[in-house]
């Protein structure tokens, strides 16, 4: 009979042979679960192109707003003559600092418009979807959604990430923005900052995307209404002026007739000379 010491290696080898097929199976892929993939598809974070596009848009707007003042900043007093030297605020470092420090907070005014495509999904104002839902609620319709009503106006994950990426971009390309401010303001900021630096050699297609509106859009309807009002006012003014002319003409005719009547009645007939 075989001793126990000889049987021990065989006993250990048998379980290893059973586990061998499991060890040869391919390792599971690391990544999100199917549910996680659906959530990722639903929440599509902004691309670098989208971030740079709206950073440039807000920089242009902020520089335009702060460029209307004629304020002069006193930079201190001279050592010898005691006279202070000044610099225009529009060309000062203070203006550049104030704009760049607050620029990313302006992106929190944006909303996510899921009904739009491309980079146009980011825009200021309430999206058409939520505007419709708000109108239904105000009319007394019960709207059931996964998101509580109190959170409808909260900042979306996409917009929050837009602001977060903006902070990183402005810090990383601070010198480029400063160079444009001091030396290249005649060049388009979107082209200078995004196409030539931030997105150099990368996809820049979103920079050319423009939202032209569509049928039923509030903005376009408002523009048409205002034009109609203006044309109506113009028509009424032209009509009133025409009426005034007609009335004026009638008045002139009446006055002319009155004057003719006065002139006709004024000459007295000459009485024949009295005969002596």
UniProtKB/Swiss-Prot annotation:
GO terms for cellular component: endoplasmic reticulum. InterPro entries: DUF3456. Disruption phenotype: The birth rate of knockout mice on a C57BL/6 background is very low (approximately 10% of pups). The animals appear normal, but their growth after birth is severely retarded. Half of them die by the end of the weaning period. Mutant mice have profoundly impaired T-helper type 1 lymphocyte (Th1)-mediated responses. On a BALB/c background, under resting conditions, they show spastic or dystonic features and, during the open field test, they exhibit hyperactivity and anxiety. Their resting electroencephalography show enhanced activity in the fast beta frequency band (20-35 Hz). Disulfide bonds join 49-206, 52-194, 104-166. Its main location: endoplasmic reticulum. It comes from the Eukaryota. Belongs to the canopy family. Toll-like receptor (TLR)-specific co-chaperone for HSP90B1. Required for proper TLR folding, except that of TLR3, and hence controls TLR exit from the endoplasmic reticulum. Consequently, required for both innate and adaptive immune responses. Interacts with HSP90B1; this interaction is disrupted in the presence of ATP. Interacts with TLR1, TLR2, TLR4 and TLR9. Strongest interaction with TLR4. This is Protein canopy homolog 3. It comes from Mus musculus (Mouse).
């Amino acid at each position: 009979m075989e001793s126990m010491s000889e049987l021990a290696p065989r006993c250990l080898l048998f379980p290893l042979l059973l586990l061998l097929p499991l060890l040869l199976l391919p390792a599971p892929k690391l990544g999100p679960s199917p549910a996680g993939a659906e959530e990722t598809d639903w929440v599509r974070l902004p691309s670098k192109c989208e971030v740079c596009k709206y950073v440039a848009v807000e920089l242009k707007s902020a520089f335009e707003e702060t460029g209307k003042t004629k304020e002069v900043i006193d930079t201190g007093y001279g050592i010898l003559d005691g006279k202070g030297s000044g610099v225009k605020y529009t060309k000062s470092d203070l203006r550049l600092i104030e704009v760049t420090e607050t620029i990313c907070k302006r992106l929190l005014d944006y909303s996510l418009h899921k009904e739009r495509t491309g980079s146009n999904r980011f825009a200021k104002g309430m999206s058409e979807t939520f505007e419709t839902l708000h109108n239904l609620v105000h009319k007394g319709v019960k709207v059931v959604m996964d998101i509580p009503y109190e959170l409808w106006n909260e900042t979306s994950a996409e917009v929050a990430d837009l602001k977060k990426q903006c902070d990183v971009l402005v810090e990383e390309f601070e010198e480029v923005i400063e160079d444009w401010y001091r030396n290249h303001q005649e060049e388009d900021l979107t082209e200078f900052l995004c196409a030539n630096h931030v997105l150099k050699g990368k996809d820049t297609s979103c920079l050319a995307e423009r939202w032209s509106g569509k049928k039923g859009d509030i903005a376009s309807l408002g523009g048409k209404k205002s034009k109609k009002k203006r044309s109506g006012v113009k028509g009424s003014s032209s009509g009133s002026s025409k009426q005034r002319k007609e009335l004026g003409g009638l008045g002139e005719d009446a006055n002319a007739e009155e004057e003719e009547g006065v002139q006709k009645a004024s000459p007295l007939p000459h009485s024949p000379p009295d005969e002596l």
